Amino acid sequence: ISWSRIYPTGEEEKPNQAGLDFYRNVFTELRNAGIEPLVSIWHFDTPLALEEKYGDWLDRKYIALYEKYVTTIFNEYKGLVKYWLTFNEINNTINFLPDNASDEAYQEAYQHLHYQFVASARAVQIGHEIDPENKIGCMLAGAITYPHTCDPKDMLLNQQTMEENFWYCGDVQCFGAYPPFAKRIWKEHNITDLDITEAVSYTHLRA
């Protein structure tokens, strides 16, 4: 589902009925054909108006706006959709940072991720409240790496690469807490000012 088809600017009080009807027709046809949909709620398609106003998930206002969006679609498609993904390839936020990325770029990327982690956890909570039958999960890009040799240094480097590019996002969403190696990653990139006040309140929620 494209967020901007439901809330074109992201901040409307009422959803776009034409957008809701479009997806209802799609899901109804799938049901008639015996196809069970797996729906991605966000696929790098934040409404442009929000990007221009608040930046790329760098403002906590996104959390409440995403909550409104998911509440709308969970209610609208109850009984038609059971399987949901909160964020598509969420780990690509950090996977595609260049090797020479600045500390500021890393700071923004990890702050961006945290707000999405909280929004994802809230979506799981809301989705289960609306329909206990909902199955809500996360989706990671398969950024798999392998050690160059069996040398312990190569093995450790590969482990740390997997931790940063893959397991960091997976652990938070599957286990509901930041993994122990998160502090190492933050230190390596001089990340010292993350706004993670909601972590205890929300990130324990999982599908």
Regions found by a protein language model. Give the residues of each.
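Short intrinsically disordered, low-complexity coil segments enriched in acidic
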Residues: 1-8, 112, 204-207
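Active-site region of glycoside hydrolase catalytic domains
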Residues: 31-206
